[in-house]
Regions:
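Cleavable N-terminal signal peptides of Sec/SRP-targeted secreted and luminal proteins
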Residues: 2-19
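Extracellular zinc-dependent metalloprotease catalytic-domain scaffold
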Residues: 18-272, 281-584, 588, 595
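Disulfide-braced loops of extracellular cysteine-rich modules
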Residues: 584-593, 617-624
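Extended, charge-rich low-complexity regions and/or helical-solenoid scaffolds
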Residues: 597-598, 603-604, 614
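Extracellular repeat turn/loop positions enriched in glycine and acidic/polar residues, especially those
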Residues: 604-606, 636-638
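Extracellular EGF-like repeat architecture and associated secretion/anchoring segments
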Residues: 646-655
Length: 655
């Protein structure tokens, strides 16, 4: 009996008799942490709510100087590291430069009531009453990870030794370098000054060095204060902004990394986690949305919309920012006016709800509520940061997100039980191909101890659904641990009786093939891994070294020496390297300078033409600037924005 058949038998049994935890809309075992953490659960929103307690300040406002020249004296940098140093003091006004992130490690291991310094230490998480010690112990393996007020019992893994500190600096250094390449910002002129009004951050925060307040920090646009305090569950790190400038941009933040995750095994996951958490500091935070600026540098009137979605059967919150919508349309191939925004997460408890993309729609995107080693940064996430008005995004730093690509408007706006192909599976399809055809997979269906929400009931049994609350309990094929068609190292040996071959050119396809003279078993229709190639505008597949041309729209092909047939995918599914022709698409995708709706470009301010390829000075710079030959306004002193219509001394409290 093959491992696939064993897995199917077990799955059938589990589908009937699965035991699970209470249905409090938390993630199930497939997403849970263990001794080998496979994913990071973010608790960002939960931390923000904790900071809203009476008497606590969420952030301070410290105006910075922009658009003026001047050379600053460097600070003594013991225990610090500077990333992305540039001679920005003489840069042209309003020209954005790679963001300079300054990392301060002074607080690592130096908070006796917060840091684990020896085994058996009892330290605080949150603000537990002193009188309760140790009456409210933390559950280090709690799931979901709980950010609360408790006392943590330190183990050897929680102590930041020399090796862990080295890993910390390496990981954060790489994070800072990634953002330096991904984002540009109007550089602070002179030293970046911080208020020092209160401790920066959460969980006791970090007291700002006096020099940061009196002299400022040279060559920096953002200061991150680093700590290594313990966390619970599979939360590897967390981060919050604590100071903003007069435009609302974060200029200081607190990043905490749990020492027990500073290991060689967690290195790749930690890298993705730190990018995720620093994104929260930079602006992917519902509490930062109210400070977002438009191209005129005026406060945005709307960042999100919340409404009752009748098709989904529940309240949803969508980001309606122009570049987010534009890149969403191009990703999903959804050019209908019915796509009005990109949905934010509504599941997963207070830690993830509202501050992440909806996992149902973006799956392994890095800003969903759980991060793993497959997480990628999409153009939609970079677009959100650019739509803040604070940054210019380098979209070449975005990764290729497969999930949902070219699936159309209905994929974004309809319940997942109406999705097509490998994006949806049910109790009668226990085995199939994953959505990208890179692996054979199974359909995990969980029986919960309580009923699921009305909108998540995709089965006659009200307590049955998919394994992830973050993905709205949708059911889709998940790869077998040994089911990869492309990775020969981790996959099981191909079944020669079925004509399978595994390797970089192989993909999963439905098949009933079996060598003549052999019996396939009880499965008349299954799936397997077969080689493919794209030649002469055709998709070809191979079995036993014999190549056959597939029908353009997909369909069955037979091979000599085999009974049964192989079902080819459509040509565009495996062979389209560029954008797929989708109804309503616009010429040149409006050059990404405008939104495409039903085949017509709606250009962003400062652009015009049928494909938004031409620049112009909006309002002729309102008489407060010079219109350059390239169609860009060069504003006079005292004015800013794409059309020089906004005074450049505006504080957070102003409209």
């Amino acid at each position: 009996m093959t491992s696939k058949q064993i897995a199917l038998i077990l799955l059938c049994f589990l589908a009937i008799n699965a035991e699970s935890h209470d249905h409090q809309l938390q993630q199930q075992s497939a997403e849970r942490g263990s001794e080998n953490i496979i994913s990071h659960s973010c608790i960002h929103d939960q931390i923000i709510e904790e900071r809203k307690r009476p008497g606590r300040q969420v952030y301070s406002v410290t105006p910075q100087i922009y658009g003026q020249s001047g050379i600053s004296k460097p600070l003594h940098r013991k225990g610090r590291a500077l990333l992305g140093i540039s001679e920005s003091s003489l840069q042209q006004k309003d020209v954005k430069q790679p963001i300079r992130i300054f990392l301060n490690y002074d607080a690592v291991g130096h908070s006796p009531d917060r840091d684990c310094r020896k085994v058996g230490d009892i330290v605080k998480l949150g603000e537990p009453p002193v009188a309760s010690r140790p009456g409210t112990p933390c559950n280090p393996h709690g799931d979901p990870p709980l950010y609360g007020d408790c006392w943590y019992n330190c183990t050897v893994d929680d102590i930041s030794g020399k090796d862990k500190k080295h890993r910390l600096r390496k990981a954060l250094g790489q994070t800072g370098d990634w953002f330096r390449r991904a984002l540009a910002v109007e550089p602070v002129k002179g030293n970046l000054r911080l208020s020092g009004y209160s401790a920066c951050g959460q969980d006791g925060g970090v007291q700002l060095p006096r020099g940061y307040v009196e002299e400022g920090v040279a060559d920096a646009d953002l200061v991150l204060l680093v700590t290594t305090r313990p966390t619970t569950g599979n939360t590897l790190a967390w981060a919050v902004a604590c100071e903003r400038d007069q435009w609302g941009r974060a200029v200081a933040g607190h990043v905490n990394v749990a020492p027990r995750h500073l290991t060689a095994e967690a290195e790749t996951l930690l890298s993705a986690t730190l990018i995720h958490e620093v994104m929260h500091v930079l602006g992917f935070d519902p509490h930062a949305f109210s400070h977002f600026r438009d191209d005129r540098k005026r406060r945005r009137s709307q960042v999100t919309e919340q409404l009752m979605d009748e098709k989904l059967g529940r309240m949803v919150t969508r980001v309606v920012l122009p570049r987010v919508v534009m890149h969403s349309r191009n990703h999903y191939g959804a050019f209908s006016e019915n796509l009005t925004g990109l949905e934010l997460e509504d599941g997963g408890g207070r830690g993830t709800s509202g501050s992440h993309w909806e996992k149902r729609l973006l799956m392994n995107e890095i800003m969903t509520g759980s991060v793993d080693t497959r997480s990628v940064v999409s153009k939609m996430t970079l677009a959100l940061l650019e739509d803040s008005g604070w940054y210019q995004a380098n979209y070449s730093m975005a990764d290729h997100l497969d999930w949902g690509r070219n699936q159309g408007t209905d994929f974004v706006t309809s319940p997942c039980n109406l999705w097509k192909g490998a994006y949806h599976c049910n109790a009668t399809q226990l085995s199939g191909c994953t959505y990208n055809r890179e692996a054979e997979g199974y359909c995990p269906i969980v029986s919960y101890t309580g009923d699921l929400p009305q909108w998540a009931r995709y089965f006659p049994q009200a307590n049955k659904g998919g394994q992830s609350s973050l993905a709205d309990y949708c059911t889709y094929f998940v790869a077998y641990s040994d089911g990869s068609c492309t990775d020969t190292n981790s996959a099981r040996a191909p079944d020669r009786m079925l004509g399978e071959v595994r390797g970089s050119s192989s993909r999963c396809m439905a098949s009933s093939l079996v060598r003549t003279g052999f019996v396939r078993g009880s499965m008349t229709q299954g799936n397997g891994c077969y080689q493919h190639r794209c030649v002469n505008n055709s998709l070809e597949v191979a079995v036993d070294g014999i190549w056959k041309v597939c029908p353009e729209a997909g369909g069955p092909v037979q091979f000599p020496g085999f009974n049964g047939e192989l079902i080819c995918p459509a040509y565009q599914e495996l062979c389209s390297t560029g954008s797929v022709s989708v109804p309503g698409q616009c010429p040149s995708s409006c050059n990404f300078n405008g939104d495409c709706i039903d085949g017509r470009c709606h250009c962003f301010i400062g652009f015009h033409g049928h494909d938004c390829s031409k620049r112009f000075c909006p309002g002729n710079c309102n008489g407060q600037g010079k219109c350059l030959s390239n169609g860009i306004c060069q504003c006079e002193n005292g004015y800013t924005g794409i059309d020089c219509s906004t005074g450049n001394v505006i504080f957070l409290g102003e409209a």
